[in-house]
From Swiss-Prot:
It comes from Escherichia coli O1:K1 / APEC. InterPro entries: NAD-cap_RNA_hydrolase_NudC, NudC-like_C, NUDIX_hydrolase-like_dom_sf, NUDIX_hydrolase_CS, NUDIX_hydrolase_dom, RNA_Hydrolase_NudC, Znr_NADH_PPase. It catalyses: a 5'-end NAD(+)-phospho-ribonucleoside in mRNA + H2O = a 5'-end phospho-adenosine-phospho-ribonucleoside in mRNA + beta-nicotinamide D-ribonucleotide + 2 H(+); NAD(+) + H2O = beta-nicotinamide D-ribonucleotide + AMP + 2 H(+); NADH + H2O = reduced beta-nicotinamide D-ribonucleotide + AMP + 2 H(+). Residues 125-248 form the Nudix hydrolase domain. A divalent metal cation 1 binds at A158, E178, E219. Divalent metal cations. Mg(2+) or Mn(2+). This is NAD-capped RNA hydrolase NudC. Its cofactor is Mg(2+); Mn(2+); Zn(2+). The gene is nudC.
Length: 257
């Protein structure tokens, strides 16, 4: 339940509006509310980090509003809480009125939800499940440059899960659609909340089965097999894509060195 911020309130401050995050001096604000001119604003505690509260403040600041990507180098737990704040702020902003009857909505006091004051419909934050998969072929890994990555970064394949589809089916479909190959021996690795804007990445490793690379030009600029010790520019540390690549490299080194 949200409340008015008082002078001595302290902690981490996730100040967000329209999927942007307030980052004075390029950092997530930490300290007393008065130091950031937040006294009198409404805040909702969305978690704790290292014993300190993490607050969500739905507010637009004139300066220093940036992307949550700018804090990806934070500790994983704090980055996830910052992402939670940005996603919740957008959820509350976009669910002021009921999609069924049009009446005004209000936030639940017990969970992350919005409730209709008229028809009692209940809405939850949207989460879009995605798959991401590292594909190994002997001593090489399949890496691709996506059309949305114009900075030369090469990464593993990924895509959204479709309605009525299992995660395993999504992997097989996305890999075939984007690269034209089939995979086998699929193994789940980990997951990562990814607030761009509201994804949940489910990460897998797989082995090459059959087929030749034929890219989907709408999705990829190129895709190639890269030997584990001769890789192109990779995604930054802290991303699940980077972890998948590093795990694959470690497996190759254990087998070929």
């Amino acid at each position: 339940m949200d409340r008015i911020i008082e002078k001595l309130d302290h902690g981490w401050w996730v100040v967000s509006h329209e999927q942007k995050l307030w980052l004075p001096k390029g950092e997530l604000p930490y300290g007393e509310a008065a130091n950031f001119d937040l006294v009198g604003q409404r805040a909702l505690q969305i978690g704790e980090w290292q014993g300190e509260p993490v607050w969500l403040v739905q507010l637009q600041r004139r300066h220093d509003m940036g992307s949550v990507r700018q804090v990806i180098d934070l500790d994983v737990g704090l980055f996830q809480l910052a992402g939670r704040g940005v996603q919740l702020a957008e959820f509350y902003r976009s669910h002021k009125y009921c999609g069924y009857c049009g009446h005004e909505m209000y936030p639940s006091k017990t969970e992350w939800a919005m409730l209709c004051s008229h028809c009692r419909e209940r809405y939850y934050p949207q989460i879009a499940p995605c798959i991401i998969v590292a594909i190994r072929r002997d001593d090489s890994i399949l890496l691709a440059q996506h059309t949305r990555h114009r900075n030369g970064v090469h990464t593993v394949l990924a895509g959204f899960v479709e309605v009525g589809e299992t995660l395993e089916q999504a992997v097989a479909r996305e890999v075939m659609e984007e690269s034209g190959i089939k995979v086998k021996n699929l193994r789940y690795v980990t997951s990562q909340p990814w607030p761009f804007p509201q994804s949940l990445m489910t990460a897998f490793m797989a082995e090459y089965d059959s087929g030749e690379i034929v890219i989907d030009p709408k999705e990829l600029l190129e895709a190639h097999w890269y030997r584990y010790d001769d890789l192109p520019l990779l995604p930054p540390p802290g991303t699940v894509a980077r972890r998948l690549i590093e795990d694959t490299v470690a497996m190759c080194r254990a087998e070929y060195e």
